Each structure stands twice: as C-alpha cells, then as structure tokens.
C-alpha cells in the first residue's frame, strides 16, 4: 500500500526494505538479512529483546554502502506513519546542519525517555563512524538486549553527537497518548498496524 501510494519511506530519495527472505513486492526486491527474526519478550521489563536482529540489519545496511549517497539514513518501522518532508524541514536547523557531517556526526533522539525504535535517524558521518568502529559496540550489544537502547548507547560510546527532537515521534510510550489522532507536526506516528488506520492517519496529515 505505502509503495503504491508513494507514502512513507517511498517519499524519500532512496529506500530499501529488509526482510529475512528475498521477495518481490510491488516492483521492489527486498534485501535479505541472514538472521532469525524471532525474539523473546522480557517478562520483567515487558520489552522485546531484539538487539541481535537489528544489529544484523544495521550490518547489512552498512555493508551495502547505499547510505553514502544520502545525507541522512532513516530506519522506519512498517507500522510507523512516517512523513519524510517534515524530517527534511527539521534537519535544516543550522545547528543540526553544522554537526551532522562534522566530527563524528549526529543522531536524532525522539523521546525524553531515550531513543525509541519506530524511527531512528543518523547522519552520513554518523553512519561512517558506526561502520568504521562497529566492533566498539559489541559490549553494548551484549548488555542491552533492546535494539533502541543498544543503538543509543552505541552512539554515545562512539562519541556521536545527539540532538533531541521533540517533534520526531508521537507514540503512547513517550507520553503522546493521543498519537492516534495524528495531529501536530510530528515526523512519525506509531503504531498503526491496520492498513485502514495507517491510511486514515496519513490522510489526516495532509500533503506534507
């Protein structure tokens, strides 16, 4: 649906879909990641322990080197209503522009509680540092079974700049309890697992 309507990641200058198998979907071939996509739920924290899965995905992304052609790389969950033009607007901020491609680059934090996984945004320089110094995050991966916590702490370990962006994500887990109304100027809204609900949300956001 998103591909047919040219919405979500298909509004970006480039896009790829990652899966555990090669498939042809709407004219697009998925990129196969050689990993088991099954993971367990931590019964105490009630969080999904998926770091190993997303480490494999990020490694595949880095190895393909497509990210080098773009100023920003975005990992967006399928059930996120993602509006790329809004992100493009926010990253024009002079501070973000200055830090994105200098030094160790920049990543965008989407919640005051810490990074949440529905949308993750890294500058090209941050991707370069992540690629070059990948092994420095192995200890973090072993200690942090949740992929968003892993990525945040990996970025910190690598000395990559952070920018807190309050309008990056609207979701219940970050105290946006009315996210489902799809109001305001957020870049992404999450979650919308039903196709009809996803489309209603996207339509409510207008032509951004």
Each model region followed by its residue ranges:
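Conserved beta-strand elements of beta-rich interaction domains across eukaryotes
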Residues: 20-24, 35-39, 78-81, 87-89, ...
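Conserved donor-nucleotide/metal-binding helix-loop-beta segment in metal-dependent transferases, i.e.
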Residues: 65, 80-114
